[in-house]
């Protein structure tokens, strides 16, 4: 079966990595997977090339994450002509895919984060696409609530799954064990500025490694200097292997202002590294049941206290429980769920239902 994955805007980020990992895992299972994008940064294109994949890009000069671009639709149409199934990631992609795909071809969408519309939401375009989509996978509670408010049928919405990096071939970077690690985009919504403010309040301060890149980097460097913690903070830059930096750390910190889930948090759990994060959106559930320590967002003092307590051994997380939770999000297990969903949509009428992979897994796999 030929599947085409369409991404609105490709940059080094969690949602794009999730789409890439899923596509690679499905190819290992015999699915033909082709990637298309509306717009892409040089780093995004290089990310795909590093995995041996060429990304076919429409070439918009602006991000198409939120845009209804008729030119993108026209560009997509001939490229989707032989597709058996189309999966769009981000509104601009699944809207365009729904317009461009041939009648009768299943079209599904994915939304990884809550919407931050740059202008008024295009309600007409949204509702038209809702009627054309066969399924819409949603990765967090905030995005689900927004979609329902904009008119999506609850039956259209399915819980999305993101796959984490494999931890089987981790090569830990030789660093002090007593360290903190942040891995993710250096963006305001991820809260790295809050982490720097908290670090300045921590007594017997450990070194902090910021693994990632993004538009907030210059601001963060200035902030570290202003706080007098410049010597304690290392800007690592983007890494395709964040697990190598997280492995063996005293804690992985996820100080997000908004987060539908968190690949970084779950990756740290798979590595048996304690996680300190914020009680926001879907991240709250990730950290529940003792799997991590949750504090209020945008509260440097609360974050500093939690880090001190963890460093001093006064607070512990359930590392085994966290590892069990993380095991549900390997590429192969996530691919099984999507493969089952695709097979349902592609099965001829009257041919019977494909085998549900959740019957062979623990029942908790469908819970974030």
Predicted regions and their residues:
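Donor nucleotide-sugar binding/catalytic pocket of nucleotide-sugar-dependent glycosyltransferases
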Residues: 56, 131-169
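Aromatic "clamp/platform" in nucleotide-sugar-dependent glycosyltransferases that forms part
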Residues: 238, 257
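Conserved acidic donor-binding segment of nucleotide-sugar-dependent glycosyltransferases
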Residues: 289, 293-300, 309-314
């Amino acid at each position: 079966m030929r599947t085409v994955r369409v991404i609105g805007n490709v940059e080094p980020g969690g949602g794009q990595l999730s789409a890439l990992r899923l596509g690679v895992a499905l190819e290992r299972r015999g699915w033909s997977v082709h990637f298309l994008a509306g717009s892409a940064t040089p780093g995004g294109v290089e990310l795909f090339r590093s995995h041996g994949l060429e990304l076919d890009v429409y070439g918009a000069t602006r991000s198409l994450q939120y845009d209804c671009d008729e030119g993108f639709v026209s560009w997509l149409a001939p490229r989707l002509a032989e597709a058996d199934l189309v999966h769009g990631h981000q509104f601009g992609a699944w809207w365009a895919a729904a317009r461009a795909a041939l009648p009768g071809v299943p079209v599904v969408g994915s939304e990884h984060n809550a919407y931050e519309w740059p202008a008024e939401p295009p309600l007409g375009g949204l509702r038209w696409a809702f009627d054309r989509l066969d399924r819409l996978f949603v990765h967090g509670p905030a995005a689900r609530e927004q979609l329902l408010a904009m008119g999506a049928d609850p039956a259209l919405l399915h819980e999305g799954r993101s796959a984490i990096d494999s931890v089987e071939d981790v090569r830990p970077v030789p660093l002090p064990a007593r360290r903190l690690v942040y891995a993710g985009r250096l963006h305001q919504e991820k809260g790295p500025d809050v982490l720097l403010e908290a670090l300045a309040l921590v007594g017997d301060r450990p070194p902090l490694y910021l693994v990632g890149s993004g538009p907030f980097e210059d601001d963060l460097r200035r902030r570290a200097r202003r706080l007098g913690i410049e010597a304690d903070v290392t800007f690592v830059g983007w890494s395709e292997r964040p697990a190598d930096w997280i492995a063996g750390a005293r804690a992985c910190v996820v100080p997000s202002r908004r987060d539908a889930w968190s690949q970084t948090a779950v990756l740290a759990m798979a590595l048996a590294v304690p996680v300190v994060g914020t009680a926001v959106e879907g991240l709250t559930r990730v950290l529940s049941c003792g799997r991590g320590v949750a504090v209020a967002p945008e509260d440097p003092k609360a974050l500093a206290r939690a880090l001190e307590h963890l460093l001093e051994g006064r607070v512990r997380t359930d590392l085994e429980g966290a590892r069990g939770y993380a095991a549900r999000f390997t590429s192969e297990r996530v691919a099984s769920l999507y493969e089952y969903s695709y097979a349902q949509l592609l099965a001829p009428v009257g041919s019977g239902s494909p085998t549900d992979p959740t019957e062979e897994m623990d029942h908790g796999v469908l819970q974030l």
